[in-house]
């Protein structure tokens, strides 16, 4: 076989493998709480503090992640801590267009599960 062709194929394969291992995902949080409540979200990923976001009613915010994304969330006097992206758990189950879509409601956090094509309750607010 032509050496140049073999080398080109090798290079192409290496580049595509390297590309897929560095895949970025998007974690989106949509505020669907009652009473126009604001949702406060404070996330950390891979030892970095990503700051605090206030997501107003019927708005969303997205983080681009490739590692675990852990967030403190609160509204009114309700508080919780959730892993909203975990590459082992989520890379295939919620990666619709590489996006983990969360809808935050009064009873808890719903995730769009690609295989079931619907939102499913994953985490309840503590105490609920
Ligand atoms: C939500 O936040 C916005 C902007 O930070 C603020 O103007 C609004 O009053 C807040 N709404 C409630 C219900 O606390």
Stretches with model-predicted labels:
Residues 2-63, 72-128:
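Intrinsically disordered, low-complexity segments enriched in small/polar residues
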Residues 67-69:
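Exposed beta-strand face motif in extracellular beta-rich ectodomains
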């Amino acid at each position: 076989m032509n050496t140049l062709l073999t080398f080109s194929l090798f290079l192409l394969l290496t580049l595509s493998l390297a590309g897929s291992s560095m895949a970025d995902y998007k974690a989106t949080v949509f505020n669907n709480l009652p009473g126009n409540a604001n949702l406060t979200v404070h996330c950390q990923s891979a030892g970095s503090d990503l700051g605090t976001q206030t997501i107003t009613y019927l708005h969303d915010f997205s983080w681009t992640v490739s590692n675990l994304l852990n967030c403190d969330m609160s509204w009114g006097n309700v508080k919780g801590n959730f892993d909203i992206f975990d590459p082992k758990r989520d890379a295939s189950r919620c990666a619709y267009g590489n996006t983990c879509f969360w809808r935050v409601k009064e009873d808890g956090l719903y995730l769009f599960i690609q295989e079931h094509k619907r939102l499913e309750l994953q985490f309840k607010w503590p105490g609920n």
